[in-house]
Design a protein with these regions (language model features):
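Conserved class I S-adenosyl-L-methionine
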Residues: 1-44, 55, 70-75, 127-160, 185-189
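A short acidic, Gly/Pro-enriched loop at the edge of an enzyme's catalytic core
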Residues: 89-100
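Conserved Class I S-adenosyl-L-methionine
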Residues: 175-258
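A short glycine-rich, Lys/Arg-flanked "PGG" loop and its adjoining helix->strand segment in the class I
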Residues: 114-128
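Class I SAM-dependent methyltransferase SAM/SAH-binding core
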Residues: 45-90
């Protein structure tokens, strides 16, 4: 959304590390999409804050996408609804305009997530659904042993879930999202059981946190993981993940009703 900086001080590149890489590596997984749809319930007129390039819209609903100019909206396919040029903290809609609202993998890009969520709550009379990552769980992923700087960035830039629930108010539930083994949405935990994928630069570039570290970090990660895969060290520690159907890590759905 509006903010293009993370706590580490690096520009968030319009909240895409690399435009083509993000579009090819971040394809919404239908199983995760179903959880979001369930959380939205019967809402039909839905506000999508941080719509970006449009890959996460809910086509079965009347979706109003919102994102700032100069970010991913420029790459939205022409057949998708036109994006409203606005930021979460100052939405150009009257109170209670929408049946529901969602923010998917975007709240950590806002200048002021709490203010943005209060504004989303103001214009939404039904459920507000936020797909995000719980920062306190980010470092539990095995990648932390190979590229701690990347997950440190992820943990710092994601607001605490308790801050999100406080800003939303009302009745709030937080649900951990199981990430499928063959997840199509290429954030780092999507490769929990497919470590070889993270040796591909395009897979890493699909997650903007990698754009905030220098070449030395990326080269060290590549050497370490490649070596552990060749020696069998990774499989001795984490090989059970290769056949685990789903991984419950930091991904959560926050749902709030008035």
């Amino acid at each position: 959304m509006n903010a293009r900086t993370c706590e580490g001080g690096a520009a968030d590149v319009g909240h895409t590390a690399d435009g083509p890489a993000l579009r090819t590596g971040r394809r919404p997984d239908p199983r995760i999409a179903r959880l979001v749809a369930e959380a939205l319930g019967g809402a039909r007129d839905v506000l999508n804050v941080g719509a970006g390039a449009g890959s996460r819209r809910r086509p079965a609903r009347a979706v109003r996408p919102v994102a700032p100019s100069g970010s991913a909206p420029a790459r939205r396919p022409v057949l998708l609804p036109r994006t409203v040029d606005a930021v979460a903290e100052d939405l150009p809609f009257p109170d209670g305009e929408f049946d529901g609202a969602m923010s998917l993998f975007s709240v950590h890009h806002w200048n002021d997530p709490a203010a943005g969520l209060r504004e989303v709550r103001r214009v939404t009379r039904g459920p507000v659904v936020v797909l995000t990552r719980a920062p306190e769980r980010v470092r539990d992923f095995w990648l932390y042993g190979y590229a701690p700087e990347v997950l440190d960035i992820e943990a710092r830039r994601h607001p605490p879930v308790r801050a999100l629930t406080a800003a939303l108010g009302g009745t709030v539930t937080v649900r951990t999202v199981p990430v499928p083994l063959d997840c199509t949405d290429g954030f780092d935990e999507a490769y929990y059981g497919r470590p070889e994928m993270l040796l591909e630069p395009a897979a890493r570039q699909a997650s903007s946190a990698w754009s905030f570290v220098d070449d030395g970090v990326r080269e060290r990660f590549d050497r370490a993981l490649r070596g552990d895969l060749a020696s069998g060290a990774w499989d001795r520690r984490f090989g059970h993940l290769r056949t685990r159907p789903a991984y419950e890590g930091s991904l959560v759905v926050v749902r709030a009703t008035p």
